[in-house]
A protein has these predicted regions:
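Output/docking surface of receiver
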Residues: 8, 63-65, 127-132, 136-161
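Conserved PLP-enzyme active-site core in the AAT-like
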Residues: 64-67, 73-76, 112, 136, ...
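Conserved phosphotransfer microenvironments
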Residues: 41-48, 67-71, 79-120, 128-134
Length: 429
């Protein structure tokens, strides 16, 4: 994946969501947490009536009577379509032998745990009308609603919850995955590559039958060529492919994002082929990936290398800050006869690209804002090979230590590229 960010420009439009449903039925139950779920009292009968009304509308219910640590239930956020948490008014009375502050802290921790990973899943509290007066604003603002016990029919409340839960699940699939689901479920025959024709080829032999049953029909029907018009084009950046690229650019706070097959190695070569010409001077981390060495050879560029430190065990450390100064880079150019000759032929040209390994296999990363301050306008393109760092933009621990992110100042002149491998560490978050 290639992320690009350049000098200031107009803000991009927000990513539009069509809100259309997906044709496949996915399992996202409504989770109900109520100590009285199976108790023969008013609260128990009310919550069971609501659960039955939801099930009668075709939605699955996952009920629990004892939640223990609410934060453990919060881990269910990736599998649920909504949460309903029952709160009794007596939990806020000292006469019942309970600490109201403990109840609120437990509830607050539950909601914070969910919202830490999922800002959109519907959360409802269920209880008596007077119970809502005990709930502070910081909790209320995170809720989709407070269900007042017996103030409306279970059937009406169920339809409301299902509407919100369905809207949530319909908005989960990003554009390309949504289009792929539609295509695989549409019963379209496959007359192009790959030659297994949607898995039909595997049905002709016993071992093929095993293969088909192991992977499942959906995977094989979705294994299609990039010539499928309904899914858009990787090369032309059209249709659902383009919509997903725009969505990814929004998520990573980039101006543009391009999906690439064959990993970051190919992404690196694409960045170089689009920015570097034969005879251009390039500044390269000596501890670079071999795809950068391939790019140097393929483009005919003239490299000067930034040398990292190395300890007595042979472990490669960071490049000293002194190596990045324009003066140090100029000295390297003058010391390299090929680079010096290239600069003499075109003294008006600055080095075309800087490529830094961010991070190395040993976890060495650099302060990007510091490098931008040093080199913005001194080098045409600042390229960060972030094959092992795609997760950095999503955690404050890495602030300023990755190429592109929210609330980061733009370069004034230089273009910034980040190349990612989503199949390495991105899934780890």
């Amino acid at each position: 994946m290639v992320l690009e960010r350049g000098p200031p420009l107009e803000a991009p439009e927000p990513f539009p969501s069509d809100g259309a449903s997906v044709p496949m039925k996915f399992r996202f139950p409504v989770v109900i947490i109520d100590e009285d779920f199976r108790t023969e009292n008013t609260s128990g009968s009310g919550i069971r009536a609501l659960a039955k009304a939801i099930e009668d509308e075709g939605m699955e219910i996952l009920g629990a009577t004892s939640f223990g640590d609410l934060s453990q239930f919060a881990q269910q956020q990736s599998r649920a379509s909504a949460f309903i948490l029952s709160i009794d008014d007596e939990e806020f009375t000292s006469a019942a032998g309970r600490d109201p502050e403990h109840v609120l802290n437990n509830l607050r921790g539950f909601i914070q745990e969910i919202r830490l990973k999922n800002t959109h899943i519907p959360i409802y509290l269920y209880g008596e009308t007077r119970t809502s007066s005990h709930i502070p604003n910081d909790i209320l603002r995170e809720l989709h609603g407070f269900i007042h016990m017996f103030e409306d029919t279970p059937e009406f409340v169920a339809r409301h919850i299902i509407r919100e839960a369905t809207a949530y699940t319909n908005g989960l699939a990003p554009p390309f995955f949504r289009a792929l689901i539609h295509y695989a479920q549409d019963g379209s025959y496959s007359w192009h590559c790959p030659g297994h024709s949607g898995g039909v080829a595997f049905l002709k032999s016993p071992v093929g039958q095993m293969f088909h049953q192991f992977f499942g029909e959906n995977m094989l029907r979705a294994d299609v060529c990039n010539a499928v018009e309904e899914l858009g084009q990787l090369l032309d950046h059209t249709g659902p492919v383009a919509a997903s690229e725009r969505n990814a650019a929004r998520i990573f706070s980039a101006d543009h994002c391009y999906f690439v097959t064959n990993g970051t190695s190919t992404s690196n070569k694409m960045v170089w082929h689009s920015t570097v010409a034969s005879g251009d001077i390039v500044v390269v981390d000596r501890n670079c990936h071999k795809s950068i060495l391939h790019s140097i050879i393929m483009t005919g560029a003239v490299p000067v290398f930034l040398m990292p430190t190395r300890n007595h065990l042979g472990i490669i450390g960071p490049i000293p800050l002194s190596e990045f100064t324009p003066e140090a880079i100029q000295k390297k150019i003058e010391a390299n006869p090929f680079a010096a000759a290239a600069q003499k032929r075109h003294p008006e040209r600055k080095p075309r690209i800087l490529t830094i390994t961010q991070s190395t296999y040993d976890g060495i990363i650099y302060n990007v804002e510091m490098l931008k301050e040093l080199l913005d306008g001194k080098i045409g393109t600042l390229h960060f090979d972030e094959a092992w760092l795609p997760h950095a933009t999503f955690h404050t621990f890495y602030r300023d230590m990755h190429a592109i992110g929210a609330d980061r100042p733009r370069p004034k002149e230089s273009m910034i590229f980040a190349t990612h491998s989503t199949h390495k560490l991105l899934a780890g978050i």
